[in-house]
Amino acid sequence: MESRSDDMKQQRHDVVIVGGGAAGLSGALTLARARRSVLVIDAGKPRNAPASHIHNYLGRESTPPGELLAIGRGEAAGYGAEIVEGRVASAERLPGEQGFRVATEDGRSVEARRLLVTTGLVDELPPVPGLAERWGREVLHCPYCHGHEVADRPIGVLATGGFAVHQALMWRQWSEDVTLFRHTGPEPTDAEYEELAARGVAVVDGEVTGLEVADDRFTGVRLAGGPVIPREALVVQARFVARSAVLESLGLVPVAQEMGGEVIGTYIPTDPTGATEVPGVWAAGNVTRLTEQVIGAAAAGLMAAGAINGDLIAEDTRNAVEARRRG
């Protein structure tokens, strides 16, 4: 993998970044350009790996996810950032103001003055056979990420909660042929039925038991009892679970995020710059903002990196003043 190795060249850095996606690499690029020593530890398991292209990224529209990461690694490494492959198991604060020690699952450790955690999230899909295999291809959740690519095609929406009606009405913007499959979701209210009917969204009762696939293409939804409803895309509500183990090892606790009165996942709270409740620790990207797209995650990495550099400058200045006073 370009600009990555298994070896850590030094054992202490200004900043260790856990996670090498858009947020982490953006933070690494910013900090390296600020002449900070930066180490990125990346497990190589990006959330958007199943997707064929990235969208809504100005200047990089329709870039394959792997290509964007390779470009980002090269850019960050070009300014001196070190990028290694590995999975971080935990982090701990060192005594005094010495920073943190980060431990990987394979037994390596490294120290840092500051931490930036950009570990993203995991999409937990409804327990319907076939969803995971088609995830990111024809099984979708974000209309802004995938809507244009399935425009004017037959689209299904799998209801597992009350948010499905909102999803169906939203995806109607991209296709006139939208069907809401009731599945295990609640029955729509009278007002919701009226809205769906007004927009021409069909509602089908019955549990979905699987997907029909032919020639490696999703072709329809199979209902209990055998009927198959032809569809070319299926929208689901995944549960977004922050990859927060590293942050939890430092004492941070993930909280539930609600949308439309439903819990859609968990995240780690931060301030607008990405600072967590643990001094010296920042988080950026989907681990703290569940609905962030790639370009937003990159922007969050930049924001956090700027705040981290400012914090380090303040510490460097305090240390310089103390040294001057000591003569």
Locate each region found by the language model.
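A conserved FAD-binding loop/helix module that cradles the flavin
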Residues: 28-29, 165-167, 284-327
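Short, well-ordered coil/turn residues at beta-beta hairpins
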Residues: 19, 112, 118-120, 125-127, ...
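A Rossmann-like FAD-binding core segment of flavoenzymes
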Residues: 70, 76-104, 109-112, 175-267, ...
